[in-house]
Structure formats: structure tokens, C-alpha cells
């Protein structure tokens, strides 16, 4: 019963659309109706930038921090309280799932990158560091957020095998689930990348 309460709480917490809330409150803009219609930092930056570039950067950074924290902080607390790895991984998946399929937005949501990073920094920090380096490099070169995010995700998955080479493949199941969720949410971006229609943001 305790685990079910934790799972429900984490899903509801992960579902909070901080980007949407910040953009509505501070910029009086509904990012669900503009840009990519995503609730993440990239769309916050893209949409708010048209009206107030300085505010756009602040709101985008705040969105990243809050989306990151809503996964990282609960996991840190649960890890400190010595909950087992199975529960921690379930919490990580649910936080990301909540962000991508928010109950408050009729199961729509963001792309899961910041929330995923928040969850994984607690469980697989070296892999997240590797992914972050790739994200920065690809972002600097191509200036395309989705491309940088997908490259970082690929680096994360590959490095999870490199740094944990002695583990059996089925133990990587949560990593595959998380990767699948994020790739699924990026399908429109992937299509635009293929047809060279994706906008530069970074």
C-alpha cells in the first residue's frame, strides 16, 4: 500500500506542467496553443522569446530546474531513506511518464528530457554526465534542441551499457522504457529533422 501511495504521488508530481504554469503566470501566454505546443523549456523559450527575449530565457531556465527537480528531489529522498532499487526505478519511470503524459493536461505533456535527467542523475550519474556533454556539443554545433536531446539520449543508453557492462541486458529494462517514452514524444521532431524542417532554438 505504501508503494502505491508513493507511485501515485510521483505520477501526480511528475504531471505538474511547470513550463505551462510559468508561461501563463509571467508571460500571459498559453504555450499549449503556440509553437510546438509542448510544455517543456524549449517551447517556453521559443514562444515567450517572440514577446520578451529576456523573460523567455529566465522562464526556460526555471522550467528546466523545476522539471529536473520534480524527479531528482523525490528520488534523492527515497534513496536516502534506503528504499530498494526496484522502487527507485519505478519512481523514475513514473516521474517521466507523468511529465510526458500529464493527467492535468488530458495525458498530453512535454518531451521528458529535463525530468529524465533529474531522475537519472540520482540513479546513473556518470551516464547523465556523458549525455550532458553530448547535448552541449551537438547543441553548439547544430543549434537544434531536439537533435541535441536525441543525441544525448543515445549517448545515455550506450553509456549505460559501457559503465555497467557486467549487468545482464534485462536489468536495463527501465532505461529502455524511459528511452522509448522520450523517443515516442519526439516523433514529430524526428519527422521534421528528416525533412530538414526543425527550427533552431539553442
From Swiss-Prot:
User: NCBIfam families, from UniProt?
Assistant: glycerol-3-phosphate 1-O-acyltransferase PlsY
Localization in the cell? Cell inner membrane
Q: Which EC number applies? A: 2.3.1.275
Q: What is its main location?
A: membrane
Gene name of the encoded protein: plsY
The text of the family note is: Belongs to the PlsY family.
HAMAP family the UniProt entry points to: PlsY
Listed name of the protein: Glycerol-3-phosphate acyltransferase
Which molecular function term from Gene Ontology is one that the record holds? acyl-phosphate glycerol-3-phosphate acyltransferase activity
Purpose: Catalyzes the transfer of an acyl group from acyl-phosphate (acyl-PO(4)) to glycerol-3-phosphate (G3P) to form lysophosphatidic acid (LPA). This enzyme utilizes acyl-phosphate as fatty acyl donor, but not acyl-CoA or acyl-ACP.
What residue ranges are annotated as transmembrane? 3-23, 61-81, 87-107, 118-138, 144-164, 167-187
Q: Name one GO biological process term.
A: phospholipid biosynthetic process
Q: What class of enzyme is it?
A: transferase
Provide the leader sequence positions.
none
Under which pathway is this protein filed? Answer: Lipid metabolism; phospholipid metabolism
Mention any one GO cellular component term assigned to this protein in its UniProt record: plasma membrane
Report if keyword Transmembrane helix is assigned: yes
Q: Which reaction does it catalyse?
A: an acyl phosphate + sn-glycerol 3-phosphate = a 1-acyl-sn-glycero-3-phosphate + phosphate
Task: Tell me how this protein sits in the membrane.
Answer: Multi-pass membrane protein
Subunit organization: Probably interacts with PlsX.
Amino acid at each position: 500500500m505504501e508503494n502505491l501511495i508513493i507511485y501515485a504521488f510521483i505520477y501526480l508530481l511528475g504531471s505538474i506542467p511547470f513550463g505551462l504554469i510559468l508561461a501563463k503566470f509571467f508571460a500571459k501566454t498559453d504555450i499549449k496553443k503556440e509553437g510546438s505546443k509542448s510544455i517543456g523549456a524549449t517551447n517556453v523559450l521559443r514562444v515567450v522569446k517572440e514577446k520578451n527575449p529576456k523573460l523567455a530565457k529566465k522562464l526556460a531556465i526555471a522550467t528546466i530546474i523545476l522539471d529536473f527537480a520534480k524527479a531528482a528531489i523525490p528520488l534523492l529522498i527515497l534513496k536516502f531513506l534506503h528504499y530498494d532499487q526496484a522502487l527507485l526505478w519505478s519512481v523514475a519511470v513514473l516521474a517521466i511518464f507523468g511529465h510526458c503524459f500529464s493527467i492535468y493536461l488530458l495525458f498530453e505533456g512535454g518531451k521528458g528530457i529535463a525530468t529524465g535527467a533529474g531522475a537519472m542523475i540520482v540513479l546513473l550519474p556518470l551516464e547523465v554526465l556523458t549525455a550532458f556533454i553530448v547535448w552541449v556539443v551537438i547543441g553548439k554545433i547544430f543549434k537544434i534542441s531536439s537533435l541535441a536531446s536525441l543525441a544525448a539520449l543515445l549517448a545515455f543508453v550506450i553509456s549505460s551499457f559501457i559503465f555497467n557492462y557486467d549487468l545482464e541486458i534485462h536489468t536495463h529494462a527501465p532505461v529502455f522504457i524511459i528511452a522509448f517514452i522520450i523517443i515516442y514524444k519526439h516523433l514529430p521532431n524526428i519527422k521534421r529533422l528528416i525533412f530538414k524542417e526543425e527550427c533552431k532554438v539553442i
